[in-house]
């Protein structure tokens, strides 16, 4: 009886561990994904790295511990890459909200000063996966989505 019970419990443990296994989403490496997007996606303007201090200033409502990497257009376009890696999936939801607010602010500014940039911003990619989130403002959304999928799953 004990052997049967042990076997059943072992089987349940294995099933439980399998259920908690990979859901397809990978943990995000913020700098690696931001670099891959910058080098692999077509942008109209040249993009320059944004410091973590600048990103922290731009993104309100972020969790306590996170790593962010980003690039912004040097010219007059709204092109931008922001990748945020956080401690867990709950923090990723906070990051998504912060990126949504940031995108809304970009749209508000564009509507006043650069209305021709609104279609680009309306087509921006905002994705949450694994332990982070990605915002990519580009016209080359097919390539960007492909790269994001490769890194996030």
Can you describe what each PLM-predicted range is?
Residues 1-11:
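Positively charged n-region of N-terminal signal peptides that target proteins for export
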Residues 21-24:
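Bacterial signal peptide processing site
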Residues 15-19:
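C-terminal motif of bacterial Sec signal peptides marking the signal peptidase cleavage site
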Residues 89-129:
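Short Gly/Thr-rich strand-loop-strand
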Residues 28-46:
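Post-signal peptide N-terminal segment of mature Sec-exported envelope proteins
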Residues 73-74, 116-153:
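A short, solvent-exposed beta-edge/loop patch
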Residues 80-88, 132-137:
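Second-shell loop/turn segments in exported
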Residues 47-78, 90-95, 121-122:
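Short, compositionally biased low-complexity segments enriched in polar/charged residues
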